[in-house]
Every structure is written in C-alpha cells, then in structure tokens.
C-alpha cells in the first residue's frame, strides 16, 4: 500500500495542473476524485457560498432529497452557515452532529457514518470547505494530514484564480475606458445605437440604416467600429450586401454605455 509520502505526492501533483476557470462546471472534480481514491471515502469541495466545486462518490450514502443538492450544485444555507463556523478541521463527526453530511433520514441506515470537514483558506480569507465522509471506520491521523494538505492545495488554486480573474477584469475595464476616451460624441452615439441593435452579445447590422435613423453619417459608424475593434472590444465581419456581423468580446462596454 502507498505510504503517507507517496499519497502526499499524488495530491500535491495536482498543483501542477491548472484549473482554468471557476466558471467551468465542477472545476475540482479531479481533486475530489483523487482524494476519494487515496483516502477511500466520498469527498466534495464547496466555496464560501455553498456552491459545489467538485465531488466524488465512491459509496452511495445520499437519499434522493440530498442527491438533488448535488445535482443543483448548491448546498442548503443552513449547512453552509454551520460549516462556515468551522475554523479548524473537525474530524470524525458522528451522524448525530449538525455538520454530518449524512441525510437525517439515513441515520439508522448508516449509524457509524463519519464526516470530516476542513476549512479552505487563501490569503487569510475563508474560501470554502473540503468535506469527506465514510459509512464507517474512523479517519486516521494520516488521512487527516492528507485532508489538511488537500485543503491547502485547493486554497492556493482558488486564490490564484481569484487574482487572475481580478487582473482580467481590470484589463478589460482599462481597455473599455481607453476605447471610450478615443470616441467623439457622435461616435459614442453611434456605438450606443449599434450595440442596442444586437441580440445579446452578437448580431447583424446595417450601418447605413442606423446612420439614417440617428442622423449621422455612415463614416462615423465605421470609424467607431474600427476604434472598438482595435481596442479588442468587438469583432466584426463583413457580410457584403447583408451588412456587418458584430460580436462583443468585452462586455464591460455595456456598463460603460449606461453612463453615456
């Protein structure tokens, strides 16, 4: 059987794999699955709001009611609030504890069920919780060491992703501000009219029709589109006689136009 060092290496190797986005469906399934295999348990990871980021079920313990929480990828508020008050790892909680992940209606089915909850921190902030559980058999000290390491690994990844997301948001806002500052009043008017024509973030438009409707020349619209495209705000493609296909790739422009 693998020793503690080998198990630790398997978990820390996940740091070498990037999680590209928290928007991805269940971005931490790999971590949960790896931990479940190594410790021989069920495992799940939730963020501070109770959103499920990943899980692995080696053993069936859920009722249909609880299974709905996993399918919805959202834990109930009462459980999330209780878990948020766990500041250090709470190990081997019985089915009678309020923090047990075993359904209340399954207490008689799994009388020896045990739950362990480890808080996930990053940069001094509480980012979520790592939860593991078994039908029986206590989690050993070695198991708990692996849980602590896993929560640290997830905390590092979550913090890095949040930092990257913040930097990306700042870059996009800066690009929008710079683009807006290059537009004349007429060009701003044209941009507002153009984006108002789109169906969501993309669509087809005819510059001459918009120009006639808002009382500007077609060249004003063309210049405005060129400035936005060069700033990386939009993508455009000529459709010939059918007009121009437009797609917004920096949605920050919509919020900025509300100030216009």
UniProtKB/Swiss-Prot annotation:
A cellular-component GO term for this protein:
cytoplasm
Residue spans making up a coiled coil are none
Binding region for DNA: 207-226
Note the SS bond partners: none
Q: Which SUPFAM superfamilies match?
A: Winged helix' DNA-binding domain
**What superkingdom does the record give?**
Bacteria
> What keywords are annotated for this sequence in UniProt?
Cytoplasm, DNA-binding, Repressor, Transcription, Transcription regulation
* One GO-annotated biological process of the protein: negative regulation of DNA-templated transcription
Concerning Gene3D superfamilies, the annotation shows:
3.30.450.40, Winged helix-like DNA-binding domain superfamily/Winged helix DNA-binding domain (1.10.10.10)
Q: Name one GO molecular function term.
A: GTP binding
GAF domain, as annotated region: 1-159
Q: What HAMAP family does its record include?
A: HTH_type_CodY
Q: What role does this protein play?
A: DNA-binding global transcriptional regulator which is involved in the adaptive response to starvation and acts by directly or indirectly controlling the expression of numerous genes in response to nutrient availability. During rapid exponential growth, CodY is highly active and represses genes whose products allow adaptation to nutrient depletion.
Family that this chain belongs to: Belongs to the CodY family.
- Name assigned to this protein: Global transcriptional regulator CodY
What is the species listed in this Swiss-Prot or TrEMBL entry?
Streptococcus pyogenes serotype M4 (strain MGAS10750)
């Amino acid at each position: 059987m693998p020793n503690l060092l080998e198990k630790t290496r398997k978990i820390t190797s996940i740091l070498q794999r990037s999680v590209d986005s928290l928007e991805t469906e269940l971005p931490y399934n790999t971590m949960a699955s790896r931990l479940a295999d190594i410790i021989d348990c069920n495992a799940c990871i939730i963020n501070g709001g109770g959103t499920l980021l990943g899980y692995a079920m080696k053993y069936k313990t859920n009722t249909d009611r609880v299974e709905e929480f996993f399918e919805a990828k959202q834990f109930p508020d009462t459980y999330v609030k209780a878990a948020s008050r766990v500041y250090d790892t709470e190990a081997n909680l019985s089915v009678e504890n309020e923090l047990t992940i075993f359904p209340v209606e399954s207490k008689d089915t799994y009388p020896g069920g045990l739950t362990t909850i480890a808080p996930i921190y990053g940069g001094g902030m509480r980012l979520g919780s790592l939860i593991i559980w078994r039908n029986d058999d206590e989690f050993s000290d070695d198991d708990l060491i692996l849980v602590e390491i896993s929560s640290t690994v997830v905390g590092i990844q979550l913090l890095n992703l949040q930092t990257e997301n913040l930097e990306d948001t700042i870059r996009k806002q800066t690009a929008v501000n710079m683009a807006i500052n290059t537009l004349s009043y007429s060009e701003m008017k044209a941009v507002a009219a153009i984006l108002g024509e789109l169906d969501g973030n993309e669509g087809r438009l005819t510059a001459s029709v918009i120009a006639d409707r808002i009382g500007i020349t077609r060249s004003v619209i063309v210049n405005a589109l060129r400035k936005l495209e060069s700033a990386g705000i939009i993508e455009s493609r000529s459709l010939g006689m059918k007009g121009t296909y437009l797609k917004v790739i920096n949605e920050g422009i919509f919020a900025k136009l509300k100030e216009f």
